[in-house]
Structure formats: structure tokens, C-alpha cells
Amino acid sequence: MSHRGSRVLRLDALARVEGEAALHLTVHDRTVAEAQLRIYEPPRFFEAFLVGRGHGEPPDITSRICGICPVAYQMTACQAIERACGVTVDGPLAELRRLLYCGEWIESQSLHIHLLHAPDFFGHPSAVELAREHRGAVERGLRIKQAGNAIMERLGGRAIHPINVRLGGFYRVPAPAELAPLAERLRRAHDDALETVRWVAGFDFPDADYDGPLLAMRDPGRYAIDSGTPAVMAAGAGSDGAPVRGFPVAEFERHVVERQVPHSTALVSELDGHHYLTGSLARYAVSGRWLHPSALDAARAAGLGDPATGAVCRNPFRSIVVRAVEVAHAVAEALRIIDAYEPPSRPYVAVPPRPATGCAATEAPRGLLYHRYAMAADGTLTLARIVPPTAQNQAAIEYDLRRQVQSRLDGPGEPAGDEELTALCERAVRNHDPCISCSAHFLNLTVERG
């Protein structure tokens, strides 16, 4: 195949990601000149919608940003506004919130592992073809996902866009007897989750390495989900006990700066002037030592090293293994919360408004999610700022694409054709599990060769 002159290849949509976008790849003389992730969905203006609304409305409004991870938006919005109002939610209410968040982690990560990501490792175009060859694995993944959905339905009222979450807690909290059936289901899901780790650990992983900074929440003593402070592992740091640098969430916007680029309706983020990665690989690097013991053992057996001694995984293709370990952890954590549950004396604490600004960050399944709100004395919102994980990862995805395509072009064998490069780019993007709708939806691919 000749690659002289310009070559253009377009796909209407990238399968197995949430949303739509385009990728523009420019290659000159076997050198990648440019890789652009073009997010072209119309801006959704959620931040503008929130201005002028009451301070109790963001949990319901922001949950509509994403149908896969609505709890992340609800929890982060609640914490930011509660912080502005000087209110702390702790005890059983905080544990119930963490349980709800575990439910979302379980369902979202299981969906990505089994339906979106795993088909790539078998050369299948979708989970339907994968199920013909590995029916038991796909059914196992669906059982795990259903267990996560059951938590969200019980605590949130429904699995998609929960309606039981409010400032200060919940509209209604469950009795212990209502959580007992969840525990039985989760015990089965825990066995399934550990088996999933063993399954994905046996995949064939291409060599790859993301050498940029990693950003995740850090909550010493436990794996950060709904709490902690932002922490950074430096670029290039590996499994050598590399130090982690933290900063207060109130300083997030001093370190993470968003900028507009012509080719995307999502803002592109930089951490202290550099592209960076948030999500499962970052969480594992920053907090892996605090995984549940069963998840720790599974990580070691899966070849991820020993997170208790600071093991780091920087191969984006192996992110599927880290996500499977996180599912095992979330199931075990959910069981811990249910087993220790004592109902709170009331379903929520009052959150009276005051003129103030508050910010918060939590770990959505796809990475760190940041919210900031300002309000007037009557609770009317005067400012809303939301920085979703996929928008933060956009520059890192483009960097990763350039490196992986360049590695293939430099490799031995026949020159890579457009079809092969397209498949490689799609896999590379799916490694990061982007939720493109949250960020502003992949793949129109344009390859220019000259």
C-alpha cells in the first residue's frame, strides 16, 4: 500500500465508548505530526443552567450530566455546597453515601470491562461477538453490574439518575433488613469480581507506558472514593516508592488550568503546565496500598506488583486489570459498610444557605471530578464550575495516541495501513474509558499522510 500524498479515512462513530468525537491524525514520512481528539458535541451548558438556581438543586441537575456515573456528580455537588455552608456530613450518613458510590463504581467499571473494553483483546467488534466465545465471562460481568445497580436502586431510588440524594444526606434511609438482600448478592459478586481479575490478567497486553503525571484523590488509610485531597505522582515515577505531592482541594484551580482549543468543545486541562492522567491507573498509583486485602491479593496475583509497597502500573492497556481490582475492592467495601450499618437518627442534616464559596472533589469511576459553587445569602447560586475527568484526560489521550501510533510506525514489518492505525487508535482511546458527553461523544478518524 502506498502512503504518499494525503490519505483520509473517516468513521462515523467509535464503538464502545460513551459519546461521539473525531480523531484527526497527521502522519508525514512515518512521523506522527499531530493527533487531535476532536470532541464536537454541542456544549451542554450545565454550569450556566445552575446559575440562579437554589443551592439545593445541583445534586438533581448535575446527575443528568451522565447516565453512567450520576452519583459522582451528586456526591461532589453535595460536598461542595455543604462545605460552603459550613456543614459536615459524617457517621452513618457518610457511610451510606460511600455505599451508594461503591454501587456506581461496581456497575460502571463492570460495564466498561466486559462490554466496552474486553472485546478489544479478542478482536471482536462488540460484546455480542465476545459473548459467543466467552459467554460465562460476559454473564459474570452482567451479574456484577446488576449487584451495583441493586445498591443504587435501594439507596438512590433508581439506578439511573438517583432521586433519593439531597444536601445533608438522603430523603429516606434504609432499615438494616432492607440491606440484607444486598449483602447476599454482593457476596456472590465478590467471588465473581475476583474471578474477573484472574480472567483479564490473562489477556495479551501490548507494551505501552504513560510517563506523565498522575492525579488522584488521596485519603490515607483507605482507598479514596468519596473523600481525600488531590495528590500527584510525578511524571515518570515508577514502582520505587515515588513520593506523592498533595495540595488542598481549595487550590485545585491554581494547579489545574483549563484552556479552550479550536478542535474541541471540551476544555483541555493542564496540571502545572503539563498533560496528566486521572482515573484507575492514577488511583492505583496513589492509593493502591489501601485496597481491601482481597483486592490487594488479587492485584499481586494479576501481575500488577505489590501495591502495599508502592507498585505503579503505567500501561494504559492494563488499565482493565486495575479496574477489575477496583471492582473487587468496591464490592468488599460495600459489604463492610452493610455489615456495620446502624441507621442514622435522621435521614439528613440541615444545610442552611449563607453567602460563601465551596469546592469539593471525589473519584468518579473515570477519575477525579471537581466542583465549585458560590452562592448568595438566600442560597441562589452565582457561580458553578465543574471539571470532569474525561476533559482532564483529553490532552493525555492525545499524547498517548501520538506515542502509540509512532511506536507502531517505527516498528518492524510492513508499514501500517489506515485500517490498522484506526484499530490501534480506537483501542488506545478505549483504554481510558472516556465519557465524552460528560466532557462537553468517538470516532471520525482522519489520517493525513504526506
Where are these regions (language model features)?
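Active-site bordering "gate/hinge" segments
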Residues: M1-L368, P388-G450
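A translation/RNA-centric and nucleic-acid-associated enzymatic feature enriched
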Residues: R366, Y370-Y373, T382-L383
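Active-site catalytic microenvironments in core metabolic enzymes, especially phosphate/sugar-handling
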Residues: G379
